[in-house]
Amino acid sequence: MSLLTRLCKGNVPLRLNTLKHLSQCGYSSHAKFSEHKPIEKIRNIGISAHIDSGKTTLTERILFYTGRIAEMHEVRGKDNVGATMDSMELERQRGITIQSAATYTLWKDTNINIIDTPGHVDFTVEVERALRVLDGAVLVLCAVGGVQSQTLTVNRQMKRYNVPCLAFINKLDRLGSNPYRVLSQMRSKMNHNAAFIQLPIGVESNCKGIVDLVQEKAIYFEGDHGMDIRLDEIPQDMRAESGERRQELIEHLSNADEKFGELFLEEKPFTEKDIKEALRRTCIQRTFTPVLVGTALKNKGVQPLLDAVLDYLPNPGEVENLAFIEHEGKEPEKVVLNPARDGKDPFMGLAFKLEAGRFGQLTYLRCYQGVLRKGDNIFNARTNKKVRIARLVRLHSNQMEDVNEVFAGDIFALFGVDCASGDTFTTNPKNHLAMESIFVPEPVVSMAIKPNNTKDRDNFSKAIARFTKEDPTFHFHFDNDVKETLVSGMGELHLEIYAQRMEREYGCPVTLGKPKVAFRETLVGPCEFDYLHKKQSGGSGQYARIIGIMEPLPPSQNTLLEFVDETVGTNVPKQFIPGVEKGYREMAERGMLSGHKLSGIRFRLQDGGHHIVDSSELAFMLAAHGAIKEVFQNGSWQILEPIMLVEVTAPEEFQGAVMGHLSKRHGIITGTEGTEGWFTVYAEVPLNDMFGYAGELRSSTQGKGEFTMEYSRYSPCLPEVQEQIVRQYQESQGVGQAEKKKKKN
């Protein structure tokens, strides 16, 4: 019995439009997705933006218009269903996206793989992972908020991975929306060569449709959910502005594209085809950013955005993807991967995300070269472990669909593969190729954590093991001195979300302590060492001598630790060098000034001595311990603290109070701007001074102010702050003040 007959027999009131939508572009079209498509018919895109710019709502509309879902739900809708891509219960409750969700859909016979990413700065590694494996992105901007702090972060990440992007100015229906201001911010703050390819026909409550500057047509979205598109002439009152903006678009394109520039200089008329080809070339080369407009919530502008994804963003064959062959002591050799979907070259894939699913660990991969079929064997390039492919799946948020094979350009997932995020997989282990891994920022906040009930310890350790494996920015360690379990992450929200997930997913309620800043210790200047470790206790003893220098790294590398072997000859036999490095890295875990990790230091081993019988790797490891203690006594040390980029937005009448509070917290104001009764201030503030700021800002701005912050860098802290940290550490260690009069710089 057909679906239609069954529904009618049950006297279910039907809306013919819904059925029409289901039958036309629903299930049948997605059977076509699994057909083997040529590379030109594939797009891998991400949807990224600042928090609350409407990314998830936009993805929901895209899935609806392409027939992937039969009805739409809002992020914070009254029906409590939540958006399709926010599959975690916590995401639906808070109305924010925490994890990247992957899905696929079909538009005009082209496969589109979409990853919806979080906008909150605490989940920035999710964005980092998504952009690493995508060929193009849609950067969503709020027509009211414009370019905000996380927009700048996403922009930097896109630049790092060379991802071409389209800009979509969303929320035209919001009070105070001003897409023209957003465009000028894109040019000034993000240095984008950007211009409108669409204009809004009215904003706020008067938002009627859009003008397409390429086709020179007005587009209106009618019928249920804006599904019927009507093309019309440009309204009379917008013709002058449309002409000016089209000319501006042509000028920007002629500056960015040589071929188009020649046509411009020859003053030949431009066809729609000329403009589209120039837009595609410049967008792929990242020399121009096309700007589209719309309102996802009010169902306007989404279908033209999908057309733009097909027209202007690259297919996997138009993006150069590299793998590297490591050579000891030399620069890695670059190898360009073949994106052809013919399976002639061996399979190469990158694991970009891990997740604990219902059936074991789920590993998300992007196939860059070759073909992978069920039953194939693949090898992990890092561990050389062989894995047999029992099941290949394609993802739609938290649902999955089995497939028999995947080709270059596809995004898919595997079950039961033991690996880390950023691992490379190949069917030919002899080629020694590895793909560049994913950049992972250092955690900046730590909190003590403990289960409320001792009987939950097993579940607690299971949760910690899973979350640390899934998220490389979530760290865990046990502090022996204070006998506390510590978790570290990118911010308070990051750690709170994991605490709530432990209770929700593992039935293990936990208590979080006060946030602690991840300080670091570093040297101020170079310090030489010459240390002899000698121990005789009958039988074979221990003998090791090491000579060298410990020196600070440049400020841009002050979160790193380096070990350099500069020895010549056999005074320190090569088999003992790893022992010295191990000793150095062990000691770097805990500094002697404040108990924090050492960083920004290079350990140069230059010479030493050994004994034919008594020397061992252990002896050289202990010699490294002694050498670092010697450098601690003789060298000058300082404490580094994380500096945050803070952006505060509030009504203009509170500007003085906001600036005063930031200065009181040792903030350095880097810029301000104001518009329509509101101002935004940008500052660099030590993270240690930012705790409790949310409450202070609320009370000083009558609840109207809001702020965002993200990690910027590590920087030396003020002398009085260093003194206080050292004193607190000494008191916690029970060291008398009289005994510790020695002051460190």
Curated annotation (Swiss-Prot):
Keywords: Elongation factor, GTP-binding, Mitochondrion, Nucleotide-binding, Protein biosynthesis. CDD domains: EF-G (cd01886), EFG_III (cd16262), EFG_mtEFG1_IV (cd01434), mtEFG1_C (cd04097), mtEFG1_II_like (cd04091). It is found in: Mitochondrion. Residues 40-317 form the tr-type G domain. InterPro entries: EFG_II, EFG_III, EFG_III/V, EFG_IV, EFG_V, EFG_V-like, EFTu-like_2, G_TR_CS. One of its GO terms (molecular function) is translation elongation factor activity. GTP binds at residues 49-56, 116-120, 170-173. GO terms for cellular component: mitochondrion; nucleus. SUPFAM superfamilies: EF-G C-terminal domain-like, P-loop containing nucleoside triphosphate hydrolases, Ribosomal protein S5 domain 2-like, Translation proteins. It comes from the Eukaryota. GO terms for biological process: mitochondrial translational elongation. Pathway: Protein biosynthesis; polypeptide chain elongation. PANTHER family: ELONGATION FACTOR G, MITOCHONDRIAL. Belongs to the TRAFAC class translation factor GTPase superfamily. Classic translation factor GTPase family. EF-G/EF-2 subfamily. This is Elongation factor G, mitochondrial. It comes from Drosophila willistoni.
